[in-house]
Amino acid sequence: MPLRASEHAYRPLGPGTPPMRARLPAAAWVGVGTIIGGVVIIAALVLVPSRASWALSPCDSGWHEFNLGCISWDPTPMEHEQAVGGCSAPATLIPRAAAKQLAAVARVQSARSSGYWWVSGDGIRACLRLVDGVGGIDQFCEEPALRICYYPRSPGGFVQFVTSTRNALGLP
């Protein structure tokens, strides 16, 4: 007796459910999209603007840029008490290291200028002799000296991250 095709057809053992596709939940897609979007935004911030746009903010009016800080000075020699009280906040007397750099770069020693600068001494009367860059305190600083006010400018953490990333990638 010949077999019919319907007798040998596949028959499931029980009532089946439609096959389920493996899917990520919507929250996972939102999370992945947020991460990818954040990476793209940070990459655009790092790569698109020029290095100049990540520079330090300009010094205030009447101040001059010096390294990572701003300086202002009075060409009249004065006593320590006047010098300390003459710098407007957030400025203070120039730190010793910055004063040495400024003296070396500017070669400011002249017949009309004072031979000393007042420098920041954390409450101690401190000065810097311009001729040789030697610093001293108290009785070493007897004569009037020039007041140079200084305030530092520092880039924020994100700017440091951007500039170091650009340096690592060799970008201008």
Curated annotation (Swiss-Prot):
Pfam families named among the record's database cross-references: UL45
Keyword S-adenosyl-L-methionine appears in the UniProt entry: no
Residue intervals annotated with topology Virion surface: 49-172
Keyword Membrane among record annotations: yes
Keyword terms of this UniProt record: Membrane, Signal-anchor, Transmembrane, Transmembrane helix, Viral envelope protein, Virion
Record's bilayer topology term: Single-pass type II membrane protein
Transmembrane segments: 28-48
GO CC annotations, alphabetized: membrane; viral envelope; virion membrane
Protein's cellular compartments: Virion membrane
InterPro entries referenced in this protein's UniProt entry, alphabetically: Herpes_UL45
Intravirion side: 1-27
Annotated function: Important virulence factor of HSV neurotropism. Seems to be required for glycoprotein B-induced fusion. Dispensable for growth in vitro.
Family of this protein: Belongs to the herpesviridae HHV-1 UL45 family.
Name assigned to this protein: Envelope protein UL45
Organism expressing this protein natively: Human herpesvirus 1 (strain 17)
